[in-house]
Amino acid sequence: MKIDLNADLGEGCGDDAALLGLVSSANIACGWHAGDADTMRRTVLLALEKGVAIGAHPGFPDRENFGRSEMRLPMEAARAGLLYQLGALDAIVRAEGGALRHVKPHGALYNQAAREPELAAVLARAIRDFNPALRAVGLAGGCFIDACRAEGLEVWQEGFADRGYRADGSLVPRGLPGALLQDDSAMLAQAEDMALRQTVAAVNGLRIPARVDTLCLHGDGEHALRFARLLRERLEALGVEICAD
């Protein structure tokens, strides 16, 4: 059995270099919600040094709220914004001798694409038009996954060890009770359920399907690096191979 571990990096928080030693995929901020040309290049170089798969982590143009505020962009603007961010990171990756492997939207863009079919379709089409070989990463069971499949893209469904789930498979919004798991044992158990049993317990107690290919390790929490080590050790002890292939 194998699974990918991914982390959102180049966002100016957390120890990116240390996390890159624990994950198999890196989602690099493309300058809109966080990051700039310098942080993109530095993170790309670190990822190449560690042999970690490089992906784009595009978001809304919302630095003030770290890309976590919902926005209602015209669909053409959403397409143009995604292409702009993909192009910026791709240019740096290629210039440094690497290859862009995947795309994972950030924050509100991620969540809206998971539940809004029109936005999901626009993003999926833009990714296909930019590079049909790119893998799309999104919330397991969400609209974005369906839209990317419809465009012929390879998809990876993502799960979260540190986020609460609603019974419909969506994430509990940040700021609401149950949105964030804090206890190491609870987070490890949730990750193990998703990786080995393809299920997750929703906040109402209902066990729901969670067919995931990759688990996200958030790098901005107080104990993020320590938990990342714990999770990797637990999965490897259970015989799970950590890889991006």
UniProtKB/Swiss-Prot annotation:
The keyword Coiled coil appears for this protein: no
EC number: 3.5.2.9
Domain of life: Bacteria
InterPro entries the record matches: Glyco_hydro/deAcase_b/a-brl, LamB/YcsF/PxpA-like
Reaction catalyzed: 5-oxo-L-proline + ATP + 2 H2O = L-glutamate + ADP + phosphate + H(+)
Gene3D superfamilies tied to this protein: Glycoside hydrolase/deacetylase
Cleavable signal peptide: none
One family name in Pfam for this protein: LamB_YcsF
Keyword Glycoprotein: no
Keywords tagged on the record: ATP-binding, Hydrolase, Nucleotide-binding
Coiled-coil blocks: none
Molecular function via GO: 5-oxoprolinase (ATP-hydrolyzing) activity; ATP binding
GO biological process, one term: carbohydrate metabolic process
Function: Catalyzes the cleavage of 5-oxoproline to form L-glutamate coupled to the hydrolysis of ATP to ADP and inorganic phosphate.
HAMAP family xrefs: PxpA
Subunit structure, interactors included: Forms a complex composed of PxpA, PxpB and PxpC.
Family statement: Belongs to the LamB/PxpA family.
Family matches, as NCBIfam families: PRK05406.1-3, PRK05406.1-4, PRK05406.1-5
Record's protein name: 5-oxoprolinase subunit A
